[in-house]
Amino acid sequence: AEPEDAIHYRQSALSVMGWQMGPMGAMAQGDIEYDADEFATRANNLAAVAHLPWEGFTEGTLQGDDHGVETDALADIGDDWEGFEERQETFKQEAATLAQMVDDGEEFSALRRQVGAVGKSCKGCHDDFRAE
């Protein structure tokens, strides 16, 4: 695949993940009313797509590489691929845990905490590997 295609792919996949995370975060923060069915749908969707974007982070697709696409993916990813993969795994595990908690019928108070853990896993990667 061309670098441009890989960048567009991963940006789209990350956008899908953000779309799923948004309402759960809003519910967890009390900005919108908790809706168990919507929350469950979003949690399961997030877990289902959590593995998607990472294959789009390929050689030649980071900031400073020779492509014509705007990207926030820092060159640091290439310098610390192992750290980047660890962040991916943490996110995937946190998202899977959230979906499992929903399936297990956990109380909203526990789900709220787990949404926080998912968000923290997003932030941990963004802080190190995404441009401001």
Swiss-Prot record:
Coiled coil ranges: none
Superkingdom to which the source organism belongs: Bacteria
Single GO BP term: electron transport chain
Database matches in Pfam families: Cytochrom_C_2
Posttranslational mods: Binds 1 heme c group covalently per subunit.
Binding, heme c: R10, Q11, D65, C122, C125, H126
One Gene Ontology MF term: iron ion binding
Keywords annotated in UniProt: Electron transport, Heme, Iron, Metal-binding, Transport
Function according to Swiss-Prot or TrEMBL: Cytochrome c' is the most widely occurring bacterial c-type cytochrome. Cytochromes c' are high-spin proteins and the heme has no sixth ligand. Their exact function is not known.
Protein name according to UniProt: Cytochrome c'
Organism of origin: Halomonas halodenitrificans (strain ATCC 12084 / NCIMB 8669) (Paracoccus halodenitrificans)
